[in-house]
């Protein structure tokens, strides 16, 4: 195969991650791109970039450019520019925070406006994060599924903390954008286990302790 033929098998996709500041967007992007979970909560100001190259069926190499948009940018002058040109949009909410789910209407409104102006239609995925906190859920699954059905979204439930279905979410979004169908064996083959640290959302200084820091396993699917 020539160099030009090899290059033709490489694709780049722009994936924009939107949602409220506490929905876990940055943790989601970090778990996918770096296979880890941050020790401290860090608010995204403006936007952050993450890159990861994956291989889809047919030996197709795809580089995902993940744009993590700060939650405070809603209503800002730059948001439409961040969204412009995206092939995929992840609308992320915290399943334990109903307000973060309701606010997705505002985020999606901006996406629709940009899509109409640019005459392009990105794939939109609804992502319910923090499924490791199922016992604290305030957004019922039927609400999630109804929102998907009403707007034609793909549906995903993940945990950036444990890594549950994180890789699978991005993999499925990329495959759907490119019109590639994943079979069961390919999905199972993508499952791996990596080390991840548990986040501390308390921004106050931590007191000293003689106990070693806790950690968990981030099972990226």
Swiss-Prot record:
**Which segments carry the region annotation Switch I?**
35-49
- Cofactor(s) the record lists: Mg(2+)
Give this protein's Gene Ontology molecular function annotations: G protein activity; GDP binding; GTP binding; GTPase activity
Q: Which residues carry this modification: Cysteine methyl ester?
A: 218
Q: Does the keyword Signal apply?
A: no
State the GO CC annotations: ciliary basal body; ciliary rootlet; cytoplasm; endomembrane system; plasma membrane
Q: InterPro entries attached here? A: P-loop_NTPase (IPR027417), Small_GTP-bd (IPR005225), Small_GTPase (IPR001806)
Which of the seven top EC classes does this enzyme belong to? hydrolase
Instruction: Tell me which UniProt keywords the record has, alphabetically.
Output: Acetylation, Cell membrane, Cell projection, Cytoplasm, Cytoskeleton, GTP-binding, Hydrolase, Lipoprotein, Magnesium, Membrane, Metal-binding, Methylation, Nucleotide-binding, Nucleus, Phosphoprotein, Prenylation
Question: Where on this chain does Mg(2+) bind?
Answer: 26, 44, 68
Q: Which residues are modified to N-acetylserine?
A: 2
- An example Gene Ontology biological process: intracellular protein transport
Protein's cellular compartments: Cell membrane; Cytoplasm, Cytoskeleton, Cilium basal body; Cytoplasm; Nucleus
Task: Keyword check for Metal-binding, yes or no.
Answer: yes
PTM comment text: Isoprenylated.
According to Swiss-Prot or TrEMBL, what is its membrane topology?
Lipid-anchor
What chemistry does it catalyse, as a reaction equation?
GTP + H2O = GDP + phosphate + H(+)
Any known activators or inhibitors?
A: Regulated by guanine nucleotide exchange factors (GEFs) which promote the exchange of bound GDP for free GTP. Regulated by GTPase activating proteins (GAPs) which increase the GTP hydrolysis activity. Inhibited by GDP dissociation inhibitors (GDIs).
Q: In which tissues is it expressed?
A: Testis, brain, and to much lower levels heart, skeletal muscle and fat cells. Expressed in the retina.
EC number(s) reported in the record: 3.6.5.2
Lipid-modified residues, S-farnesyl cysteine kind: 218
What assembly does the database describe for this protein? Answer: Interacts (prenylated form) with PDE6D; the interaction promotes RAB28 delivery to the photoreceptor outer segments. Interacts with KCNJ13; the interaction may facilitate cone outer segments phagocytosis. Interacts with RELA; the interaction contributes to RELA transport from cytoplasm to nucleus.
Function comment:
The small GTPases Rab are key regulators of intracellular membrane trafficking, from the formation of transport vesicles to their fusion with membranes. Rabs cycle between an inactive GDP-bound form and an active GTP-bound form that is able to recruit to membranes different sets of downstream effectors directly responsible for vesicle formation, movement, tethering and fusion. RAB28 is required for shedding and phagocytosis of cone cell outer segments (OS) discs in the retina. Also participates in nuclear factor kappa-B p65/RELA nuclear transport in endothelial cells.
Question: What NCBIfam families does the annotation carry?
Answer: small_GTP (TIGR00231)
Q: What is known of its domains?
A: Switch I, switch II and the interswitch regions are characteristic of Rab GTPases and mediate the interactions with Rab downstream effectors. The switch regions undergo conformational changes upon nucleotide binding which drive interaction with specific sets of effector proteins, with most effectors only binding to GTP-bound Rab.
UniProt-recorded name of the protein: Ras-related protein Rab-28
The protein's organism comes out as: Rattus norvegicus
What is this protein's gene name? Rab28
């Amino acid at each position: 195969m020539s160099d030009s033929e090899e290059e033709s098998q490489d694709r780049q996709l722009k994936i924009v991650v939107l949602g409220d500041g506490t929905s876990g967007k940055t943790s989601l992007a970090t778990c996918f791109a770096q296979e880890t979970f941050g020790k401290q909560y860090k608010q995204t100001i403006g936007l952050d970039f993450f890159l990861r190259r994956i291989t889809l069926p047919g030996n197709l190499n795809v580089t995902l450019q993940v744009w993590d948009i700060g939650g405070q940018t809603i209503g800002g002058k730059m948001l439409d520019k961040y969204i412009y040109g995206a092939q995929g949009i992840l609308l992320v909410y915290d399943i334990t925070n109903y307000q973060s789910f309701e606010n997705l209407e505002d985020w999606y409104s901006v996406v629709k406006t940009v899509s109409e102006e640019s005459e392009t239609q990105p794939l939109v995925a609804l992502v319910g994060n923090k499924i490791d906190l199922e016992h604290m859920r305030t957004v019922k699954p039927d609400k999630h599924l109804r929102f998907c059905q009403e707007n034609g979204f793909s549906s995903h439930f993940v945990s950036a903390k444990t890594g549950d279905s994180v890789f699978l979410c991005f993999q499925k979004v990329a495959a759907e954008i490119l019109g590639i169908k994943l079979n069961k064996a390919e999905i199972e083959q993508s499952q791996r286990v990596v080390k991840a640290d548990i986040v501390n959302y308390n921004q106050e200084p931590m007191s000293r302790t003689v106990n070693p820091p806790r950690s968990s396993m981030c099972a990226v699917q």
